[in-house]
């Protein structure tokens, strides 16, 4: 064991994941794996206005198809040994490795449940004029035992998707700056992605294992959501970064701030419901100006997280004659005084 937190909810091992997994006695509920994509082939990509190398390290260097299959089969078999009979595994990839992962999972007796498409809402432009921009990654979700009933929080996923069935295409942003305050990893996954995975497939108190832990995003998300974490990685530098991130959320203010941020979906649309008298409502529609009182008194609106996603306004008069309007620009609003509104023909009473 390389590290164990004071609360025993964050355990790290340093070494080859295949070897460490064979020595583990414990059984885990869910595995999240972000194995090498084998993308490091000497190529480049555009970042900002610069052309930078895509090489992540020796561990990500391109291999032959036979070597990729052999590598994936070995670590997947090792994972199967520590997974509970009704447990599930999530594996990330791109077209470079995901087909091999799917084949090896099936060959090892796993049953594929879903293949999630993570569509990045802020993809990095890809160098070249002969192909579409690479903006998606894929996540295979599979269960160990084809006959066992796995856990899926169906109701919560519907709730998170506005009452509709959660689709298998997830539009989520890449890693935000607020996730890199302790440092960063070249293939770091966003906490919001792990939030959805963990909430969908685990219960509070469950144990999640990551055989390619890196900077321990899985562990941070797990602990923020009252799950236990076991992580394995060969890099001492990244394990130290993971420990730093764990210690960062020991601060209560930081813990609750992060807990709130990972549950937010920047792509979610906010609708403001606004009451207006009949004459005021007609004037709002005619002028294209909608106003509402901001503050903390009765009948006013507080500016809260999510307001920046405001895209629609629902106008009504005493709950009747409801009309929905789309803003010209998402999240755009101005603070006007009573005098400014009067110049536009309105007569606000406060």
Where are the language model's segments positioned?
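Core catalytic lobe of class I
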Residues: 1-232, 237-239
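Compositionally biased, charged N-terminal/linker segments
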Residues: 257-321, 329-332
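Aromatic- and Lys/Arg-enriched surface recognition patch
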Residues: 320-350
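Conserved SAM-binding loop
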Residues: 242-243
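Short mixed-charge
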Residues: 1-4, 253-261, 340-341
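Conserved phosphoryl-transfer catalytic core
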Residues: 53-59, 247-260
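A general structural signal for short secondary-structure junctions and capping/turn motifs
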Residues: 130-132, 159-162, 303-307, 313-318, ...
């Amino acid at each position: 064991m390389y590290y164990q937190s004071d609360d025993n909810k964050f355990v790290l091992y340093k070494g080859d994941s295949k070897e460490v997994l064979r020595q583990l006695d414990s059984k885990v509920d869910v595995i999240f794996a972000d194995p090498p994509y084998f993308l490091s082939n000497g190529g480049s990509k555009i970042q900002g206005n610069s052309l930078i190398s895509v090489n992540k390290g020796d561990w990500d260097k391109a291999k032959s198809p036979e070597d990729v299959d052999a590598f994936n089969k070995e670590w997947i078999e090792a994972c199967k040994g520590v997974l509970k009979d009704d447990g599930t595994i999530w594996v990330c990839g791109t077209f470079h490795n995901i087909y091999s992962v799917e084949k090896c999972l099936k060959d090892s007796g796993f049953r594929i449940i879903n293949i999630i498409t993570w569509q990045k809402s802020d993809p990095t432009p890809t160098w070249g004029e002969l192909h579409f921009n690479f903006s998606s990654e894929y996540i295979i979700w599979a269960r160990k035992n084809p006959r066992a009933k796995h856990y899926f929080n169906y109701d919560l996923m519907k709730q998170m998707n506005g009452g509709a069935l959660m689709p298998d295409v997830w539009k989520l942003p890449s890693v935000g700056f607020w996730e890199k305050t302790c440092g960063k990893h070249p293939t770091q996954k966003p906490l919001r992605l792990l939030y959805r995975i963990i909430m969908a497939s685990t219960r509070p108190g469950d144990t999640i294992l990551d055989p390619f832990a890196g900077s321990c995003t899985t562990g941070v998300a797990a602990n923020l959501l009252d799950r236990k974490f076991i992580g394995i990685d060969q890099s001492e530098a990244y394990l130290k970064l993971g420990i730093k991130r764990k210690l960062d959320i020991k601060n209560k203010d930081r813990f609750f701030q992060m807990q709130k941020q990972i549950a937010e979906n920047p792509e979610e649309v906010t609708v403001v419901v606004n009451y207006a008298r009949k004459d005021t409502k007609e004037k709002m529609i005619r002028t294209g100006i909608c106003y509402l009182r901001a503050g903390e008194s009765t009948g006013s609106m507080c500016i809260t997280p999510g307001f920046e996603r405001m895209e629609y306004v629902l106008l009504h008069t005493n709950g009747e004659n409801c009309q929905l309007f789309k803003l010209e620009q998402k999240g755009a609003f101005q603070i006007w005084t009573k005098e400014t509104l009067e110049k536009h023909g309105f007569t606000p009473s406060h």
